[in-house]
């Protein structure tokens, strides 16, 4: 009796799910995809997917179903995409701007990554103000100051012994991001909270137990409580900073004080993102949204710039000719007592771009369609992707396409000097990264003195790629240093 009732319920649920998605199914008949079981869809494709086997499984999937396909999981329609033709159409479209990053909603809610499409343009303009010419120069000066601390730490490890560069580089990047956004050097507790919270979300990614919000609420109550506690601690710090800035502004108005005299960071000339958001006096910009913006920029800056720098150093170490070319360029571009002219470091810029082509820090770019998306395609024809589709662009596979990039798996910085190909690591169109120029300048500011002061040696194991929200290495970023 119980088995019969269960079977009937399963059949009814399957029928309901099928008929509810009839229109969606009719619009994607031209797309290949895995076999779809009743109710569960192609759940078997995700069941054993892990951060470590993601890249092997992804390559196998694309080989079998193509770079533009469909995959049903229960009632959800996924569109795995590694096709530049359609990716460009989607990313450059100014209507479909929803990113669909529900996993991090508790932490990054209200930030630029998750704000509504109608708010995006205004928020993008505010953040872009952080990187205008005058302020950008001050941020680069701040980066140079942090680089001095980085060199001191690296000098202690320059004994030609293998170590993981991540644990030296990432704290410096984190400090830089927080000083850029909040205008204050983070305390040890703040840094630890941000790292711990990032690690919780990294563990949740690709986990059937905790990726879904309901499953996470049900199966991981202790982790969920810890996550919420860490979010509260970070936001309490942000609220304290907001209150401090508001009181300083009041003092400045009443007593003519210079607000910058009260700032607790070594270099006081740059304007922080927090100041820009507060000075905008936008009545629609709430305290919660400001916290979300600070959390978003701190997280993205820390989690994307740190692996980019580490992958670049490991790659340079294993390509001696590339390292020598970088050194020659640094010698030519050096300014006495002022570091380097970053604009003249074209080859180093190409090395960074080629590294991010092979190892894009953000492997997956998502879009969630709120309405039908008409497209044209040279292979599958002209059609529409239905409303409700969840599109995930796989940059790792897309940027290793042999048709687009000759010898795609081979490191060749020269390709970005001759006729630079399109790079999607910073996205395209209206939702592209507003910090693109700053992040490239930051990476060059950190890389240049490292290469000038140390020979980077290819010791240790090769990186073993894994995907936990951002691209990483399961065995770290191993290399050795030798003083020049």
From Swiss-Prot:
Q: How does it sit in the membrane?
A: Peripheral membrane protein
EC top class named in words: oxidoreductase
Task: Name the positions where heme binds.
Answer: 433
Do you know which InterPro entries this protein is assigned to? Cyt_P450, Cyt_P450_sf, Cytochrome_P450_Monoox
Question: Which UniProt keywords are present, listed alphabetically?
Answer: Endoplasmic reticulum, Heme, Iron, Membrane, Metal-binding, Microsome, Monooxygenase, Oxidoreductase
Which cofactors go with this protein?
Answer: heme
CC terms in the record's Gene Ontology section? endoplasmic reticulum membrane
GO MF term list: heme binding; iron ion binding; monooxygenase activity; oxidoreductase activity, acting on paired donors, with incorporation or reduction of molecular oxygen
Query: Where is the protein found, in the record's own terms?
Result: Endoplasmic reticulum membrane; Microsome membrane
Q: What is its EC number?
A: 1.14.-.-
Q: Which residue ranges traverse the bilayer?
A: none
Q: What role does this protein play?
A: May be involved in the metabolism of insect hormones and in the breakdown of synthetic insecticides.
Family classification: Belongs to the cytochrome P450 family.
Name of the protein in its database record: Probable cytochrome P450 316a1
Its taxonomic placement starts with:
Eukaryota, Metazoa, Ecdysozoa, Arthropoda, Hexapoda
